[in-house]
Amino acid sequence: SRGTFFNARTYLNHLNPEYLRYYFASRLTNTIEDIDLNLSDFQARVNSDLVGKIINIGSRCARFINKDFGNELASELNNNKLHDNIIENKNEIIKNYEDRKYSANIRLITSLADEVNKYLDEEKPWVQIKDDNNRGYVQKVCTDGLNMFKVLAGYLKPIIPDCVDKIEKISIL
């Protein structure tokens, strides 16, 4: 222990317990070792990785689907290759959970989220939507993003089940 102490009730009065679950999962391996709660690292992992990289995918894409397409997803994907790559990691993620390699899963899921964010950054739906001729394309790109977001969220369900339950209840997903 390095002087980091807080009362569990105090934490629960101010923060979602799933943030702590996510943080601990990002630090847990299948070995027996102490985990130091570093509040700066905690804040960075939750804000940057969980919210900034993963949750933001859903937020970025849902905004377009909701506002510009009346909550209607495209009938087909634009980037099947990236979607298939996300799905192909399922067995490795399951195995990591079975082997209690939680931090390995967080790294893998975060790297997959990085790929999705890179795709969205390259396709620039916020620019493409300005041209009416690109509306169908933007709908497909955002459908890609939401589908991949839902898969990534599913991969995190053992760690943040309440958050994922809320995501699964969103009608456009």
Residue ranges and their predicted role:
Residues N78-I86:
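Membrane-interface interhelical connector segments
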Residues F42-L77, K90-L173:
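Helix-rich, typically C-terminal accessory recognition domains appended to large enzymatic cores
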Residues P17-R21, K81-L82, K130-D132:
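Generic detector of short, locally flexible boundary/turn motifs and exposed helical patches
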